[in-house]
Amino acid sequence: MSTSPLSVVILAAGKGTRMYSDLPKVLHPLAGKPMVQHVIDSALTLGARQVHLVYGHGGDLLKAHLSGQPLNWVLQAQQLGTGHAMQQAAPDFSDDEDILMLYGDVPLISAATLQRLIAAKPQGGIGLLTVKLDDPSGYGRIVRHHDRVVGIVEHKDASEAQRRINEINTGILVANGVDLKRWLARLDNNNAQGEFYITDIIAMAHQEGRQIAAVHPERLSEVEGVNNRLQLSALERAYQQQQAQRLLLAGVMLTDPARFDLRGELVHGRDVVIDTNVIIEGKVTLGNRVHIGSGCVLKDCQIADDSVISPYTVIEGARLAQACTVGPFARLRPGACLDAEAHVGNFVEMKKAHLGRGSKAGHLSYLGDAEIGAGVNIGAGTITCNYDGANKHQTVIGDDVFVGSDSQLVAPVTVGRGATIAAGTTVTKNVGDGELVLSRVKQVQLSGWERPVKKK
């Protein structure tokens, strides 16, 4: 078992021609984040002291998307094979560290599998991740002698006998820095592809009497790469299936696990129920007995115990206290905050707005930059007019206020505790405690009036 410090090399120089995209292949998202970010996260989970990212095509885009990551950027100007890519990073290797080689387009490799691989690496030898396939066509074959790994032969260079081998190379390996640099310096491109194969170091290690330990991943999907969108979609489904199984086993009821997408992190309590076609992004926290209806999208939000989110509601950057009810077809934008037992109904939008305990906004309203007290009724069609064309302004509504339907509150404005706003009122001035305010046009009734008749 190796106790050396660890650095990681991630190969990400490929163009991804078969993706038919202007975006570098490794930046295509899986579960809401770039494929290569999944690999970086696994590397950092292992405690890597340095992560070298070998890049080529789309370097500017890669650096823009990954600007906040602790990476050592290594340019591979020409893509001449995996061995060539590692040669570009080799000057940065320390003699006393282990080097783990990963791929930016193999996104589901788990930290647990990599930890087993690192632990299995013999002193002075190589840890190699391999897998057995029913159809190994196109992959490098693992060559063994008396059950010991002695080499890897690429498919195009393999003999007929070697092509019958079903154990294949995943490309993921770990070796000590001083050994790896020596082997990389001896690589040549005398093969059918005219490339420098990293796999040639296996035979070199065997010739030196070094041991090669083969380890298998927990799941085949961990070592499956992406060359086209079909493969990417298959890995997306594999990932989502894993997440759904994990949540079900942890007590979350997913009505249909095949129709659930987790694109971030879900923290949950007991007896949570999530209906079909729900998407969770960022970090979402659901308390005990929370029910999420079909078709909801939740992003970076907190929903406390006994709350019910009805179908087709979108919640982002919001906080909901206990026993809130929201939706259907509601939208809570960043900064929305609901106190306990508050209700937001269909076609209501909130942004940077606080709705007090037991307050209700049942229908067809916009509440933006608003501070709303407890026990308030917001009538259908109420609008807080928060934008004057240049700046946003706040509306403050005290406790126990009744706002009639089709009212507009032109901010900045304050409505005092217990006030009543009559239906159809436009509030432009502050309203005192307990006051009634109404600004309707006087009703006029004309007897004997007839509608115009269309001219023929």
From Swiss-Prot:
Cross-referenced InterPro entries: Bifunctional_GlmU, GlmU-like, GlmU_C_LbH, Hexapep, Hexapep_transf_CS, MobA-like_NTP_Trfase, Nucleotide-diphossugar_trans, Trimer_LpxA-like_sf
Residues annotated as transmembrane: none
Binding sites annotated in the UniProt record for Mg(2+): D105, N227
Cofactor annotation: Mg(2+)
Stretches the record annotates as N-acetyltransferase: 251-456
Catalytic reactions of this protein: alpha-D-glucosamine 1-phosphate + acetyl-CoA = N-acetyl-alpha-D-glucosamine 1-phosphate + CoA + H(+); N-acetyl-alpha-D-glucosamine 1-phosphate + UTP + H(+) = UDP-N-acetyl-alpha-D-glucosamine + diphosphate
Entry keyword set: Acyltransferase, Cell shape, Cell wall biogenesis/degradation, Cytoplasm, Magnesium, Metal-binding, Multifunctional enzyme, Nucleotidyltransferase, Peptidoglycan synthesis, Repeat, Transferase
Region (Pyrophosphorylase): 1-229
Gene3D superfamilies: Hexapeptide repeat proteins (2.160.10.10), Spore Coat Polysaccharide Biosynthesis Protein SpsA, Chain A (3.90.550.10)
NCBIfam families: glmU (TIGR01173), PRK09451.1 (NF006986)
Name of the protein: Bifunctional protein GlmU
Organism of provenance: Edwardsiella ictaluri (strain 93-146)
